[in-house]
């Protein structure tokens, strides 16, 4: 096993522990708490994949961080912070919408790269909107936290979420996954639109009807993908 992989996991475990202590003092805002929960799932998945104990890794990560801080001067810290581009966290969904449990009458699941796509194939003839919480850097989608499909009545009928065991995805991965979800929902004569915020930062455009600019051949391909897996 690569030593950098192990040490990276150890540092991530310790930093999560620090953030958890911060949250326990009721100091974290909604985006902070949301990332904390999702990073916990990711660490559990990575720990299982690597065969490493999280508690032991946290202690080792603490030693690594302490060693770095002992060697770090205040001036070097200022320069590092100034050179790192800041990302923004954007929210279409409330914390309640993100954390709400939902159930599918006819469940369908597909894995696309490091993203998991889920939808209820029992939903028909509905108006559906896709909402997402994600981070943005350089005015482009950086990391998807969670995307969910809602009916006009507020019911959740679909979802795209990162796989905890496979961290890392691009904006193209997200757009492709959205295409799969749209294709599956439209196959049952649902009308799907994407939130203006998601259109703006994923496709850098905004259509009045809420339709992302998916090429016609891609939409046909997505519909066939869903159909073939039913």
Swiss-Prot record:
- Outcome of swapping residue 71 to G: Abolishes the formation of closed homodimers, open homodimers are still able to form
Extract the ranges annotated as region (Disordered).
205-230
Record InterPro entries: NS1, NS1A, NS1A_effect_dom-like_sf, uS15_NS1_RNA-bd_sf
- UniProt keyword annotation of Hydrolase present: no
Q: List the disulfide bonds.
A: none
The UniProt annotation puts motif Nuclear localization signal at 34-38
Task performed by this protein: Inhibits post-transcriptional processing of cellular pre-mRNA, by binding and inhibiting two cellular proteins that are required for the 3'-end processing of cellular pre-mRNAs: the 30 kDa cleavage and polyadenylation specificity factor/CPSF4 and the poly(A)-binding protein 2/PABPN1. In turn, unprocessed 3' end pre-mRNAs accumulate in the host nucleus and are no longer exported to the cytoplasm. Cellular protein synthesis is thereby shut off very early after virus infection.
**Annotated GO biological process:** symbiont-mediated suppression of host cytoplasmic pattern recognition receptor signaling pathway via inhibition of RIG-I activity; symbiont-mediated suppression of host gene expression; symbiont-mediated suppression of host mRNA processing; symbiont-mediated suppression of host PKR/eIFalpha signaling; symbiont-mediated suppression of host type I interferon-mediated signaling pathway
- The protein's organism comes out as Influenza A virus (strain A/Blue-winged teal/Minnesota/993/1980 H6N6)
Which cellular compartments is it found in? Host nucleus; Host cytoplasm
Q: Where is this region: RNA-binding and homodimerization?
A: 1-73
Q: Where is this region: CPSF4-binding?
A: 180-215
Protein family (similarity comment): Belongs to the influenza A viruses NS1 family.
Q: How does it assemble?
A: Forms homodimers and higher-order oligomers. Interacts with host TRIM25 (via coiled coil); this interaction specifically inhibits TRIM25 multimerization and TRIM25-mediated RIGI CARD ubiquitination. Interacts with human EIF2AK2/PKR, CPSF4, IVNS1ABP and PABPN1. Interacts with human DLG1 (via PDZ domains 1 and 2) and human SCRIB; the interaction results in the translocation of DLG1 and SCRIB from the cell membrane to perinuclear puncta. Interacts indirectly with human LIN7C via its interaction with DLG1, the interaction facilitates translocation of LIN7C to cytoplasmic puncta.
**What are its GO cellular component terms?**
host cell cytoplasm; host cell nucleus
Q: What is known to happen upon mutating residue 187 to Y?
A: No effect on oligomerization
**GO molecular function ontology, one term from the record:** RNA binding
Entry protein name: Non-structural protein 1
**Keyword annotations from UniProtKB, A to Z:** Eukaryotic host gene expression shutoff by virus, Host cytoplasm, Host gene expression shutoff by virus, Host mRNA suppression by virus, Host nucleus, Host-virus interaction, Inhibition of host innate immune response by virus, Inhibition of host interferon signaling pathway by virus, Inhibition of host PKR by virus, Inhibition of host pre-mRNA processing by virus, Inhibition of host RIG-I by virus, Inhibition of host RLR pathway by virus, Interferon antiviral system evasion, RNA-binding, Viral immunoevasion
Among its keywords, does the record have RNA-binding? yes
Q: What is known of its domains?
A: The dsRNA-binding region is required for suppression of RNA silencing.
């Amino acid at each position: 096993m690569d030593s950098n992989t192990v040490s990276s996991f150890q540092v991530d475990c310790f930093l999560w522990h620090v953030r958890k202590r911060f949250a326990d003092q009721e100091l974290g805002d909604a985006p902070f708490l949301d990332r904390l929960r999702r990073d916990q799932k990711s660490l559990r998945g990575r720990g299982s994949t690597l065969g490493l104990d999280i508690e032991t890794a946290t202690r080792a990560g603490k030693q690594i961080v302490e060693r770095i801080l002992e060697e770090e001067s205040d001036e070097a810290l200022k320069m590092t912070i100034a050179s790192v581009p800041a990302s923004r966290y954007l929210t279409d969904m409330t914390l309640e919408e993100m954390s709400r449990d939902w159930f599918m009458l006819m469940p369908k699941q597909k894995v696309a790269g490091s993203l998991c796509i889920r939808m209820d194939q029992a939903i028909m003839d509905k108006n559906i909107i896709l909402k997402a919480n994600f981070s943005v850097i350089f005015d482009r989608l950086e990391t998807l936290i969670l995307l969910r499909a809602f009916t006009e009545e507020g019911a959740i009928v679909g979802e795209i979420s990162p796989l905890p065991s496979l961290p890392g995805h691009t904006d193209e991965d997200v757009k492709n996954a959205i295409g799969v979800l749209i294709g599956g929902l439209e196959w049952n004569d649902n009308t799907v639109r994407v939130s203006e915020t998601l259109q703006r930062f994923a496709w850098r455009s905004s259509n009045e009807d809420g339709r992302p600019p998916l090429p016609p051949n891609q939409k046909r391909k997505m519909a066939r993908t869903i159909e073939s897996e039913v």
